Amino acid sequence: MKISIIGIGRLGGALALALSKKGYSIENLIARQGETAEKIAENISPKPQILNASETEKLGGSEIIFITTQDSEIEAVAAGLAGKLTNKPFVFHTSGSLSSQILRDLNESGCRVGSIHPLVSVSDSFLGARRFKDVFFCLEGDAEAVAVAEKIVGDLQGKSFAVETKFKALYHASAVTASGQVTALISIAVEMLAACGLTNEKAQEILLPLVKSTFENLEKQTPAEALTGTFARADVETMKKHIAAIKETLAPELLEVYLQLGLRSTHLAETQGASAENLALMKKILAVENAKNWKGNLQG
């Protein structure tokens, strides 16, 4: 199938390289920075045409168009294409948070539209092109578009799942929680350990094997089954010591994270046979401490 890609950043370049190796014909690369697009094009055979943003009328022969621009530009790109694509191709964007509704102008002009979002970090186009194998892709859009997207992902040796349009933002929140916010959480753990007199670098080095072992457990168990430590044991006294130590040493917002995650942990522990009496007491303490912390933040 003939493909054009609008927006040759890291992901757009990675898709161009990966799809060309799977037999797709990359016809056009549309980019602001011709130098970046040229580097990608030189590694594709036959070499695609490089166009600027004002030449989208030349995309009429494309069967599939990917819009891989920044999220803030997708709607304007779609509006600019509407009416120019007489062959009514499939059009996909690759935003994680936006749904195919952002392509409504193209849909109204007869194009089949959808979104394809790979759950992988692409920091370089050439490295990214080799990372799609076994990666999950979130698909969303009209039925025909999703069917085509499933084939594309299969050809890339990836795995796909579809969500309804109304759930696209929630899906993305899940992905951000599992990636960027996990990183933020680990940074809090590092700060806690560093407050014991270690450097941040040493604290991170010490904690990473523990983090890795947790993820290894999660590969085989549910979150509730993988829960270990203070909350899994419903250890009230140890939790009290944690709270006191954090209060004494660290900022209130870090205590809030501990309290909120502690509450979530008690819910997980309930399903694993921990002491119901102790868990009820832990919940009460967490709620009281959270209220105090909020009051202190407001007064501060």
Which residue stretches match the model-derived regions?
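Short, well-ordered alpha-helices that flank and scaffold nucleotide-derived cofactor binding pockets
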Residues: G13, L17, K21, E42, ...
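NAD(P)+-binding Rossmann beta1-loop-alpha1 motif at the extreme N-terminus of oxidoreductases
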Residues: M1-E57
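Short active-site oxyanion
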Residues: M1, Y24-N28, S62-I65, N87-V91, ...
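NAD(P)-dependent dehydrogenase/reductase Rossmann-like domain
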Residues: S265-G300
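Interdomain hinge/lid region at the active-site interface
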Residues: E219-A276
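Rossmann-like NAD(P)(H) cofactor-binding subdomain of soluble oxidoreductases
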Residues: I44, Q49-L127
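Internal alpha-helical scaffold of NAD(P)-dependent oxidoreductase catalytic cores
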Residues: T36-N43, G110, G128-K220, K283-E289
